[in-house]
A protein has these predicted regions:
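Conserved beta-strand-loop-alpha-helix hinge in the C-terminal portion
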Residues: 219, 223-246
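Walker B catalytic motif
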Residues: 166-170, 177
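Helical segment within the ABC ATPase nucleotide-binding domain
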Residues: 179-194
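Q-loop/switch helix immediately C-terminal to the Walker
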Residues: 84, 88, 94-109, 118-121
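ABC ATPase NBD Q-loop/coupling interface
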Residues: 61-77, 141
């Protein structure tokens, strides 16, 4: 599904290279995790895949479903089925939650949205993720707590039906109950859409108690330095990076 080939990425308009010839291959139905110390490029990786304007691909390729998307704009990548659950979701004043999702869904599917069914489905889904239905008519993420913003990202995921999901520190700002509910919704989505693949960016293995990974990768110095299974994340939690031979 997603292949990163010798991907090097820098901060736009600088010489600050963050990712250096990084390689990663994620197949259909797989859950991959990126872990690593602060400042190693984990969030840069997620934004580079999504096509964030603050980063430039210096060399290498981003291949999605056998198509080179390296030079595509963010909206074009979203239409192809890539979704980024952001670490700090953007506030958009004057655009309601329902208006945003209805427009985004119509853009991605190319179909006109039935308003009555949409509102009914959205109210049900908001209940599933633990959001009050009054937030349906509020400006996107305006006045939302950190946890509410993350729940709103999961709500968007359910409605936009992506093929590839990037969870950039979903567990940051969520209490135990909220994290469990968010992960239950993501797991249910993956069960209903079994070819969906997920890339989890995280510092801590807590989220992996709810979403079970196939592979855990350690990112350091712009490259993946080590790959393992869930036990690798447990080992890092217990002993730190130095104990597995990575000098953080």
């Amino acid at each position: 599904m997603l292949k990163l080939e010798n991907l090097s990425v820098k901060v736009k308009d600088t010489d600050n290279l963050i990712l250096d010839n990084l390689n990663l291959n994620i197949n259909n139905s797989e859950v991959h995790v990126i872990m690593g110390p602060n400042g190693t490029g984990k969030s840069t990786l997620s934004k580079a895949i999504m096509g964030h304007y603050k980063f430039d691909v210096v060399s290498g390729n981003i291949i999605f479903n056998d198509e080179d998307i390296t030079n595509l704009e963010v909206n074009e990548r979203a239409k192809k089925g890539i979704f980024l659950c952001m670490q700090d979701p953007t506030v958009i004043e004057g655009v309601s939650n329902s208006e945003f999702l209805r427009t985004a869904r119509s853009e991605i599917t190319g179909e006109k949205v039935n308003l009555f069914k949409f509102i009914k489905d959205m109210e049900s889904s908001m209940k599933d993720v633990g959001l009050d239905s009054s937030m349906l008519h509020r400006s996107l993420n305006s006045g939302f707590s950190g946890g509410e913003k993350k729940k709103n990202e999961v709500l968007q995921l359910k409605f936009l039906q992506p093929k590839f999901i990037i969870l950039d520190e979903l567990d940051s700002g969520l209490d135990v109950d909220s994290l469990r509910i968010a992960c239950e919704n993501i797991n249910n989505y993956m069960e209903e859409n079994p070819e969906t693949s997920v890339l989890i960016i995280t510092h801590y293995p807590r989220i992996l108690e709810y979403i079970k990974p196939d592979y855990v990768h350690i990112l350091m110095d712009g490259k993946i330095q080590k790959t393992g299974d869930y036990s690798l994340a447990e080992q890092i939690e217990k002993d730190g990076y130095k104990m597995i031979g990575i000098d953080a």
